[in-house]
Regions:
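Active-site signature of alpha/beta-hydrolase-fold catalytic machinery across serine-
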Residues: 64, 144-148
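Phosphate-handling substructures
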Residues: 65-119
Length: 187
């Protein structure tokens, strides 16, 4: 079983360097183009199910990638980390260590995001008819999911670009995910 966990395309808040987790902003023209380019990655992959975060930036990305030809489900479990009262503020306010910082401001900890993502992706892949699944999520959520299975530093060092795809193999017996590749599409 294979899970393709993908980050959404570039958004207005990405360009403006605004913190966005629970809040949302639209895809930019470049973000729309990125999703179109990323769709080619899936040309020879027979996806059987698709999911996205409830954020519009993620569902819009998924619709572009699948040419609006595939039904999908929006899941709260795939949402980005909640940054509390820092939502919509400048990224310059981000602390060096984000692991628990936002909890005191009504947000989530990194461990909470990791547990939510692991639970959600495991529930998705445990379904019998789910062999090749696309799930569109967010940079922070993708990093915290990866952190459950390996040290993410090497992957993060090379960037979590918009529309990058994390290809995971799901082991049904062990209920674990193994990262096979990260496709950044040259972005």
């Amino acid at each position: 079983k294979t899970l393709y966990l993908m980050r959404h395309g570039q958004t207005l808040f990405n360009v403006r360097r605004k913190i966005q987790g629970a809040c949302d902003s639209p895809l930019t023209e470049l973000g729309i183009q990125q999703a179109g380019i990323a769709s080619a990655y899936f040309d020879d992959i027979d996806l059987d199910h698709a999911y996205s975060s409830t954020a519009e930036r993620a569902s819009d990305t998924l619709e572009i990638v699948t040419n609006e030809l595939m039904p999908y489900k929006r899941l709260k479990g795939l949402k980005e980390m909640h940054f509390g009262t820092f939502e919509g503020e400048s990224e310059d306010l981000n602390p060096k260590d984000k692991s628990t910082f936002f909890v005191q401001y009504g947000g989530e900890s990194g461990d909470q995001v990791m547990e939510r993502m692991v639970r959600t992706c495991t529930e998705i892949m445990e379904q019998d008819d789910h062999q090749n699944v696309l799930a569109v999520s967010h940079a922070g959520a993708c990093i915290h999911f990866l952190r459950a299975w390996q040290d993410p530093r090497e992957v993060v060092k090379n960037g979590i670009t918009n529309c990058c795809v994390f290809k995971y193999e799901y082991d049904v017996e062990a209920k674990t995910f193994a990262l096979l590749e990260v496709e950044r599409h040259g972005f």
